[in-house]
Amino acid sequence: MQLIFQLGIATQDGTIKVDDLVRPFRNDNAFSFIGKPKIFIIQACRGGRSQVKEQYIEPNIIHEADSTVCARLPTDADIIKIFATTPGYYSYRTVDSTSWRGAWFIQAFIAVARELPKSHIQEILTAVTHELAINPEYEIDGEKCQLPMFEAALSKLFYLKGKRRKKIKN
């Protein structure tokens, strides 16, 4: 099992820092990628604790952020790092279900991306976060859960455009 801690992604051969994975694709190192989105999806644990659900009262407050555009792009522009869970917590997978198997984050991401084919990546990721937070299918013992996290430095909206699958005739 691969685990990600504060120091990086633990592998069989050692630890790899997420920044070491991203660095070659930054705008100061990969000129042909300037202005193009670079997406890194890290499906791994980020610690040894189980996240639990807490009760809350939902406020009716909406915040709007101003958006500004730069004429030149900063070194870290157009990079998005997507983590299956927040720092310090487990990332879960289902291994014994008859309906589906696999990592909760990846399953939720695929399902939401299919439901929202015209949405940009940050809308999709927000919907994935919501899905993992409220859907009881992504819980253990009605309490333990997983919450993804992303760090986005996108200078424009990014849309996933999938090809329609052809139906196979029997």
Regions found by a protein language model. Name each.
Residues 1-170:
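Cysteine endopeptidase catalytic domains of the caspase/legumain-like
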